[in-house]
Amino acid sequence: MAAPSDGFKPRERSGGEQAQDWDALPPKRPRLGAGNKIGGRRLIVVLEGASLETVKVGKTYELLNCDKHKSILLKNGRDPGEARPDITHQSLLMLMDSPLNRAGLLQVYIHTQKNVLIEVNPQTRIPRTFDRFCGLMVQLLHKLSVRAADGPQKLLKVIKNPVSDHFPVGCMKVGTSFSIPVVSDVRELVPSSDPIVFVVGAFAHGKVSVEYTEKMVSISNYPLSAALTCAKLTTAFEEVWGVI
C-alpha cells in the first residue's frame, strides 16, 4: 500500500537498505488539484489505450498480460501482443519519478482500452517491481481506488469519462505520433505560463486516435517507446521551465 511522506529529503542509504516500492512523495511546491479548470503552467499527460484488464485465474484475479496469459488470450481470439501492462508501468515510472512531477508541474491520467479512466495523484510513487504494480492495478480496477496506508488520501482512483472534462479550460491538446512527417522540437511546444495536454499511446502497435486533440506531432526521427516519449516530454519541459 502507500504512505504519505512529510517531504522528499534525499539521503544516503546503507548497502542493504532498499527504497520503499509504494508510497507518497509530496511535490516541493503547492500544485493545482487534478481536474482543476484554472490555468497555471503544468504538463498534463494522458496515457491512452493502456492495457489494464483483470482476468480470473483459479480463485484469484490477475492483471492480464501476454507473458502469463497467452493461452487465455488465444482461446478468446485475441492478439497476445495487445496485453502489455508493462508499457503503462514503465511510462508511469518515467513520469512520476521526474523532477517535473516533484516540482508540482505534472498531472497524469490513464485511459484504458476498456474505457476506464484513472487519475494518478502526483504524490504517488509507483512500485518498482512489475508484480507489485500488477497487484495494485488489480486492486484499483476492482475497488476503484487505492488509498494511502495511513490516511484517507487516494493515490489512484477511477474517475468519470471523458478525460477532456478534467482538462483546464482552453488548454492546448497535442497528440504524439511517429507517422507525422515533420519532427517537432518539444521545447518549442512548451508554453511559458499555460497548461498543455500531451497524449501518449500506451500500447505496443498502432497510433493515438482521440477526438479532442487539436494537433498531432512527432518528436523524433525514430519510433519511440511510450516510456521514452514520456521521458523526452518531461525533460523538455524541465529545461524550458528551469526545473533542475
Swiss-Prot record:
The keyword Lipid metabolism does not apply. It comes from the Eukaryota. The record marks 84, 125, 128, 132 as: Interaction with substrate rRNA. Its EC number is 2.1.1.-. GO terms for molecular function: identical protein binding; RNA binding; rRNA (pseudouridine) methyltransferase activity; rRNA binding. It is an enzyme of class 2 (transferase). GO terms for cellular component: chromosome; cytoplasm; nucleolus; nucleoplasm; nucleus; small-subunit processome. PANTHER family: NEP1/MRA1, RIBOSOMAL RNA SMALL SUBUNIT METHYLTRANSFERASE NEP1. S-adenosyl-L-methionine-dependent pseudouridine N(1)-methyltransferase that methylates pseudouridine at position 1248 (Psi1248) in 18S rRNA. Involved the biosynthesis of the hypermodified N1-methyl-N3-(3-amino-3-carboxypropyl) pseudouridine (m1acp3-Psi) conserved in eukaryotic 18S rRNA. Is not able to methylate uridine at this position. Also has an essential role in 40S ribosomal subunit biogenesis independent on its methyltransferase activity, facilitating the incorporation of ribosomal protein S19 during the formation of pre-ribosomes. Belongs to the class IV-like SAM-binding methyltransferase superfamily. RNA methyltransferase NEP1 family. This is Ribosomal RNA small subunit methyltransferase NEP1. It comes from Homo sapiens. The lineage of its organism: Eukaryota, Metazoa, Chordata, Craniata, Vertebrata.
